[in-house]
Amino acid sequence: MQVSPAIVKGIAVSSLGLYAGILTSSTVISITTPINVLTQHLKNVLCTLGCWSTVLGGLATGAFGLSYYLAAPGERPNYLLCGLGVAPLSAAYLYLVSLFNHKLAPKCTRDQNDLEKQKDEKLPQHHPEVKDGEAACPFSKMNNAKTLKPESERSVKCHSYMSLHMSIVTGITIFTFGKCILDGFKA
């Protein structure tokens, strides 16, 4: 049974598009939501989005690799290599930034100023009021009675640092997705 390169390219580009969409959603949620709501009420939702983005990123990487392999040696377009590398490179980049942010940077600890800033953060317009220990995300499996481990709570400074890097990766992923679509029409 022979696999059509066009079908594999379609799967690759579709997976990359879904990956870019999930990454964009995660970034928007992270930027617009105060850190205390993220760590207390939306942590499971973001973890689920992370799992799905890993699956879709792996599928896109595999499909782009297979498309590149199936293409004739003289007709291997560059966008296949771009699509092949974007998910693993973005995952590695975010992992290293997160590692630096949470393990190696001693300045990313909570202090009294962070707690005051966090209390002053505004929720998005028309969002119900969230008080510590009362509200929970309807999609979260987390029980309100459970307390978080201290290392899962991050400072406002760390939150803004990670949001910046997530925005960078999201922009690069969306650009690569657009490049794959436009270059795919040329071929």
UniProtKB/Swiss-Prot annotation:
Subcellular location per the Swiss-Prot or TrEMBL entry: Membrane
GO biological process, one term: macroautophagy
Membrane topology: Multi-pass membrane protein
Transmembrane segments: 11-31, 45-65, 80-100, 162-182
Domain of life of the organism encoding this protein: Eukaryota
Chain residue ranges for the region called Disordered: 114-135
Biased composition, class Basic and acidic residues, residue ranges: 114-134
Keywords recorded for this protein, A-Z: Membrane, Transmembrane, Transmembrane helix
GO cellular component, one term: mitochondrial outer membrane
InterPro entries found in the cross-reference section: ATG33
Coiled-coil portions: none
Miscellaneous comment: Present with 3210 molecules/cell in log phase SD medium.
Similarity comment: Belongs to the ATG33 family.
Protein name: Protein SCM4
Gene: SCM4
